[in-house]
């Protein structure tokens, strides 16, 4: 079984809804990135980039699981982008009952690195395993 690299319309609409809400809250504009880009959006104001944004939607409530994971691949992309631009990358998560965010940097500073489990609960192929960082949701700021 192969894993689809393309988001579906529901993913696209969910990301856009959250991006619009954050743009209003943070008084900025959001620039959606193309498929296969390193991040989902760039927040900017007066044509000046402010932050990269990566979105995730969970089908659980905020308190159902005490942690979130992010792949080493995503952290490498963040590290390279931050080294060049100095911009933060906010990891934005929508749970069934909350929306929150944290800087990807927190996954490096406070996270625990592990090998991912084999599971059907991710979009990856069942047997894909990689290094991940596991971060307590205590590091997320709820909106």
Regions found by a protein language model. Give the residues of each.
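Acidic-basic catalytic patches of nuclease active cores, encompassing PD-(D/E)XK
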Residues: 1-35
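Short connector loops at helix/strand junctions that flank enzyme active sites
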Residues: 36-38, 48-52, 73, 84-86
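Conserved catalytic cores of phosphodiester-cleaving nucleases, focusing on short active-site segments
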Residues: 41-61
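Short acidic/glycine-enriched loop/turn segments that link adjacent beta-strands
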Residues: 35-39, 97-99
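Non-catalytic C-terminal interaction segments of nucleic acid-processing enzymes
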Residues: 6, 24-26, 44, 79, ...
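Short, conserved, surface-exposed binding loops centered on an aromatic residue
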Residues: 32-33, 42-44, 83
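Catalytic cores of nucleic-acid endonucleases
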Residues: 2-9, 24, 56-101
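Residue-level detector of beta-strand structural context in well-folded domains
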Residues: 39-41, 90-91
């Amino acid at each position: 079984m192969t894993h689809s690299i393309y988001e579906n319309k529901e993913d696209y609409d969910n990301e856009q809804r959250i991006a619009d809400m954050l743009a209003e809250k943070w008084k900025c504009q959001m620039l959606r990135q193309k498929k296969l880009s390193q991040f989902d959006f760039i927040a900017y104001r007066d044509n000046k980039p402010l932050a990269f944004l990566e979105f995730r939607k969970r089908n659980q409530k905020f308190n159902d699981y005490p942690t979130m994971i992010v792949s080493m691949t995503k952290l490498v992309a963040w590290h390279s982008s931050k080294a060049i631009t100095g911009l933060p990358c906010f990891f934005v998560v929508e749970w069934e009952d909350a929306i929150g965010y944290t800087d990807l940097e927190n996954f490096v500073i406070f996270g625990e690195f592990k090998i991912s489990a084999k599971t059907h609960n991710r979009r990856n192929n069942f047997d894909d395993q990689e290094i991940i960082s596991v971060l307590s949701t205590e590091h997320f700021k709820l909106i």
